Regions:
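Aromatic-lined, polymer-binding surfaces characteristic
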Residues: 1-158
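Context-gated lysine
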Residues: 55, 60, 78, 105, ...
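Extended polysaccharide-engagement surfaces of secreted carbohydrate-active enzymes
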Residues: 129-349, 353-367, 371-372
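Surface-exposed interaction regions enriched in Ser/Thr/Asp/Glu
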Residues: 368-389
Length: 391
């Protein structure tokens, strides 16, 4: 079993099985070293711990917090927070200091300012750890950490949904939707794919009434993707709510431009054979005919029309023509991040706009004819904290 402490402690909480609870405790007091799972066992199995076992496990959690203090990754900050919350009331002072360190100094002092200034401080693969932080803080302290960066969390469900490659991966236990990743290998990381789904399920559980959550719920409730493997099944059981109504993801937009962090995701339709483009973390990827191709937006010279959006590679293109059918948005990628540009459309009066933190510019072009566009960079790059100027 990949995560025996988590799985057995969860089973004990739900079923009351003393055998499962004792197995979780034995793992935690023995070879168990994963701080997150240790915290869950200590919290969920507290009523079957002897006094000696409780003290021993509390000491192990306290050591884990101290020994991991140099690791400031989001998953480890999550684990230390869970451990500190579990220890609260069992040890004096230290748990409260750790909670303050994670919530006030790290989240509010570092992560929120980074997100609001356009830095990608939360990686896609850390979405589940992020949601565990949100849940434990709200459940224990009645505080919603989303309030510090509302745009990031409003965009998160749709960014998460559109940043999956169109083709799914059939595994022995279930099918997987594969989240986009930098430096794609030959085989998908199915553990990462399972945690991606767990993160989506926990997003819905956190705020089931949010518009993005309702679409995400419709995306999740497909039996082919239920996590049935030994790693994923406990997460599915913990978070999935098949009785929660959702909206069909066919109603969701096929284009999402995250102007806060400078990311862009487009797919041509909802079929598994769809064409897909993703621009994130400075990398441009195309998915077509089941394969991912990485492109250099600074050297690519052609436009890409995915039926839902037109993408222009603008690093070397300062003058171009573009024809957008219907109401397709037009994006220029590969520009200088946070830089002011003069935009001249069909030799008419110029307007001014600013590229986002990823170097993406959303162009407002006429949709009834081919338009000639000229881009001219102007001025110095804007500061990271500057807001996007409207033309």
């Amino acid at each position: 079993m990949p995560e025996p402490g988590f799985a057995q402690a969860l089973y004990y909480q739900v079923s009351g099985s003393a055998d499962a609870g004792q197995q979780a405790v034995a793992w935690a007091l023995g070879a168990g070293a994963d701080l997150r799972q240790l915290a869950l066992v200590f919290d969920w199995c507290q009523d079957i711990l002897t006094e000696a076992q409780s003290k021993a496990l509390a000491a192990k959690l306290a050591r884990g917090i101290q020994q991991s203090r140099r690791d400031s990754s989001l998953p480890m900050m999550r684990s230390r927070l869970l451990a500190a919350v579990a220890l609260s009331g069992h040890l004096p002072d230290d748990p409260e200091r750790e909670i303050d360190q994670v919530v006030r100094k790290w989240w509010e002092g570092q992560i929120v300012p980074a997100l609001n200034s356009g830095r990608e401080a939360v990686a896609r693969e850390d979405a589940y750890a992020l949601m565990e932080i949100l849940h434990v803080v709200r459940d224990n302290f009645n505080q919603d950490l989303r309030e510090g960066s509302p745009q990031f969390f409003t965009d998160l469900p749709m960014v998460d949904l559109l940043s999956c490659y169109p083709a799914t991966f059939p595994a022995g236990e279930n099918d997987y939707r594969i989240p986009a990743a930098l430096h794609v290998g030959d085989q998908p990381d199915l553990r990462r794919a399972a945690l991606s789904r767990a993160g989506e399920l926990s997003m819905v559980a956190y705020d089931s009434n949010a518009p993005g959550s309702q679409i995400l719920q419709g995306w999740l409730m497909n039996d082919h993707f239920l996590l049935r493997g030994t790693f994923g099944a406990p997460y599915e059981f913990l978070w999935a709510n098949p009785y929660q109504p959702g909206l069909s993801y066919f109603q969701a937009p096929l284009v999402v431009h995250d102007s806060l962090l400078g990311r862009l995701f487009v797919r041509s339709d909802w079929d598994e054979s769809a064409a897909w483009l993703g621009y994130f973390s400075g990398e441009l990827q195309m998915f077509h005919d089941g394969a991912v191709t990485t492109l250099d937006p600074r050297s690519a010279a052609e436009q890409v029309d995915l039926k839902r959006a037109v993408i222009v590679f603008g690093a070397r293109t300062r003058k171009f023509k573009v024809a957008a059918a219907g109401k397709e948005p037009v994006f220029v990628v590969g520009l200088k991040p946070r830089h002011d540009y003069l935009i001249e459309m069909d030799d008419e009066e110029m307007s001014e706009a600013r590229s986002d933190p990823g170097g993406i510019l959303d162009l407002d072009v006429p949709h009834d004819r081919e338009a000639g566009v000229r881009l001219q960079p102007t001025g110095e790059p804007a500061k990271a904290t500057a807001r996007l100027e409207q033309p």
